[in-house]
Amino acid sequence: MSVLLETSAGDIVIDLLVDHAPKLCENFLKLCKVKYYNFSPVHSVQKNFSFQTGDPLGPLSKDSDGGSSIWGHLSGDPSERTFPAFFHPKLKHLERGTVSMATAPLQSDPDVRVAGSQFIITLGQDTDFLDGKAAIFGKVVEGFEALDKINEAIVDEKGHPLIDIRIKHTVILDDPYADPPGLREPSTSPPPTDQQLKTVRIADEAALHEDDNVDEEELERRRRNREAQAQALTLEMMGDLPFAEVKPPENVLFVCKLNPVTGDEDLELIFGRFGKILSCEVIRDQKTGDSLQYAFIEYEDKASCEAAYFKMQGVLIDDRRIHVDFSQSVSKLSDVWRKDTNSKRRTNAGRGGWGGVDELEKRRQYRDEGERVTGGNYRMVYGEEEMKGKVGRNAPKQDKDDGPPPPGPRDNGEPSRQQNRSRSPRPRDRSRDRYHKPRDDRRGDRRDRDRRDQDRNRYRDRDHRDRGREKDRYGRDENDRRSRR
């Protein structure tokens, strides 16, 4: 015994285990026979685990009662909406595609679980968590591709698909059970009710078959429209456009293929016969000033612009056949909008905040207001202890009546080593040069020079005496040698 479920994700064929769960299979078969499941939404999708369906309205509808069994549906008795579910000990949720009835504990007896119309189909292996909670009555034998699509569906935080996945039709391939009293099989599939239509998020037909039977040109046009909308939204977010749906002005013409010698006055004279021209500008290179061979002409009204468009297309100007079209540029509109926005910001700039908005305060200081005064409070290099006693730092100011301060260890005009922490080469100290010494030090230098001159004279006199003695001794020796001869 089998049932075919036609869903928006594909066809699914289910084999029923009538020998192990006869009452569950009878309930499912008869509900399919009366088209109870038609347009029922797929919900509670858990990837690689399971999904649930069988409620004609679904959990998103406030009017949903959770579904009913075939006996409660035929009689209308609320007590027959559910029936006790049977759990066969040999049937386990071990395989992908296991079909089981969703159950809930009976309010009067929590140990008894009852079923209605909703059923579960597993999307993964070893889903034994459902054992004892869902009553197995069948298994999927065909249509695993549809299970893959449902498994990959985009869902919200509650597991409801953003694009509707619904049961469109049910076909019974084999039914061994007799019809209960009052059952009438509809001749055709009934259309969805108003309550069911209210639960539609995104219609599956529009989403899944939007591009069916559409030629390539139409698909390309749709693709370009989507790209244009995305780019316009991006430009709006970046601030280049006032809004994404901005349209170019209808009173501006775009003229191209111009001769480089054609100027603004020439075009204004030629196009001026169709109406009053507000502006005529040939676009030029910013650096060289050469014409880029296209221009924009703005008319006072739309009618003049249309007349020029129909009359001037392909006209010969300065030996060039020009091309005329309606302008698609929104740069002027963007410039006007941007200038207006900036002027508002400048007007509101004095009101506080950033751009005139009080909540947007641009922070300009990185220290407390009390620390903004430069001077002794700056401690980027020295610690608090090192800053104590530094000349010109934290030392208290002396009054004029106290007299001059006592000289410090380096109060002679030389820079302090601790104050100068630069790693650059030290400049030459001209005060140590010979010719740039202070006047008070010249006397000491003169005395040193006189002392050196005296020592030099004394050494010179000693050398003269030594030479004379050697000469006398040499002369006596020579006389002795002569006398001996």
UniProtKB/Swiss-Prot annotation:
SMART domains: RRM (SM00360). The lineage of its organism: Eukaryota, Fungi, Dikarya, Ascomycota, Pezizomycotina. Residues 1-172 form the PPIase cyclophilin-type domain. PPIases accelerate the folding of proteins. It catalyzes the cis-trans isomerization of proline imidic peptide bonds in oligopeptides. One of its GO terms (cellular component) is nucleus. Residues 426-485 have a biased composition (Basic and acidic residues). It catalyses: [protein]-peptidylproline (omega=180) = [protein]-peptidylproline (omega=0). SUPFAM superfamilies: Cyclophilin-like, RNA-binding domain, RBD. This is Peptidyl-prolyl cis-trans isomerase-like 4. It is found in: Nucleus. Keywords: Isomerase, Nucleus, RNA-binding, Rotamase. The gene is CYP6. Residues 377-485 are annotated as: Disordered. It holds the Pfam family RRM_1. It comes from the Eukaryota. Belongs to the cyclophilin-type PPIase family. PPIL4 subfamily. InterPro entries: CRIP, Cyclophilin-like_dom_sf, Cyclophilin-type_PPIase_dom, Cyclophilin_PPIL4, Nucleotide-bd_a/b_plait_sf, RBD_domain_sf, RRM_dom. Residues 251-329 form the RRM domain. It comes from Gibberella zeae (strain ATCC MYA-4620 / CBS 123657 / FGSC 9075 / NRRL 31084 / PH-1) (Wheat head blight fungus). One of its GO terms (molecular function) is peptidyl-prolyl cis-trans isomerase activity. Its EC number is 5.2.1.8. Transmembrane segments: none annotated.
